[in-house]
């Protein structure tokens, strides 16, 4: 079970598959074990507006320049106030659900993607993103260890050792 990020924020990186390059401005951890990184392009779009941040799995990230790396924690439990899988409630709207994804942004804004229980007909409902300060811990919920599954099947190129 992954419990820490591999890469620091504010480094120049690229996606090893597509070649997309940018500054690593966000990193997120998922209840089901993966970590992703948000790369913000350094150049503007053709219309002069900022280009969209793109997210890539940790295994696809290649660091190009770590000169300006942020001095930040990498352990999830030292970054986030509420553990993954916790049942939480939004203090503003009353929305309640489980924290499935936690995101750390470069400029000190941690956010949680929370998904509510199924509706009265048993249908899944859409989750919502909330800033950390808006959420109150309700209960333990489900731990990452309870949903961890061993890898099965073929080896994908992203799982092979890299130089």
Regions found by a protein language model. Give the residues of each.
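Beta-strand-rich cores of mature extracytoplasmic or soluble domains
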Residues: 61-66, 126-128, 132-163
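Weak global preference for isoleucine
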Residues: 25, 61-63, 79-82, 102, ...
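Low-complexity, intrinsically disordered short peptide segments enriched in small/polar/basic residues
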Residues: 2, 9, 14, 58, ...
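Basic/aromatic-rich interaction segments and small domains that mediate binding to polyanionic partners
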Residues: 2-6, 12-60, 91-93, 98-134, ...
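Mixed-charge, Lys/Arg-rich low-complexity intrinsically disordered regions
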Residues: 1-11, 64-87, 159-163
């Amino acid at each position: 079970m992954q419990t820490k990020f591999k890469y620091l924020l504010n480094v120049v990186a690229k996606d090893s598959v597509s070649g997309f390059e940018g500054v690593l401005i966000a990193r997120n951890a998922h209840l089901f074990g993966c970590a992703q990184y948000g790369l913000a392009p350094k150049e503007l779009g053709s219309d002069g507006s900022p280009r969209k941040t793109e997210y890539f799995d940790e295994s696809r990230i290649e660091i190009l320049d770590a000169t300006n790396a942020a001095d930040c924690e990498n352990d999830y439990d030292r970054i986030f106030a509420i553990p993954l899988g916790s049942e939480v409630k939004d203090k503003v709207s009353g929305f309640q659900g489980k924290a499935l994804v936690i995101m750390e942004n470069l400029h000190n804004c941690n956010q949680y993607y929370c998904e509510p229980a199924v509706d009265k007909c048993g249908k899944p409902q859409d989750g919502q993103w909330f800033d950390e300060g808006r959420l109150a811990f309700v209960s333990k919920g489900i731990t990452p260890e309870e949903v961890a599954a061993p890898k099965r099947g073929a080896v994908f190129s992203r799982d092979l050792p890299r130089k």
